Swiss-Prot record:
GO terms for molecular function: N5,N10-methenyltetrahydromethanopterin hydrogenase activity. This is 5,10-methenyltetrahydromethanopterin hydrogenase. Very sensitive to O(2). Keywords: Methanogenesis, One-carbon metabolism, Oxidoreductase. Catalyzes the reversible reduction of methenyl-H(4)MPT(+) to methylene-H(4)MPT. Its EC number is 1.12.98.2. Homotetramer. It catalyses: 5,10-methenyl-5,6,7,8-tetrahydromethanopterin + H2 = 5,10-methylenetetrahydromethanopterin + H(+). It holds the Pfam family HMD_N. GO terms for biological process: methanogenesis, from carbon dioxide; one-carbon metabolic process. Belongs to the HMD family. Pathway: One-carbon metabolism; methanogenesis from CO(2); 5,10-methylene-5,6,7,8-tetrahydromethanopterin from 5,10-methenyl-5,6,7,8-tetrahydromethanopterin (hydrogen route): step 1/1. InterPro entries: HMD_N (IPR055205).
Length: 19
C-alpha cells in the first residue's frame, strides 16, 4: 500500500506488506 507507506512512514507497512 503506497498510501500507507507515505502515511505511516514505511515502518509499519514493512510488517504489514512485508516490504
Amino acid at each position: 500500500m503506497k498510501l500507507a507507506i507515505l502515511g505511516a512512514g514505511c515502518y509499519r507497512t514493512d510488517a504489514a506488506s512485508g516490504i
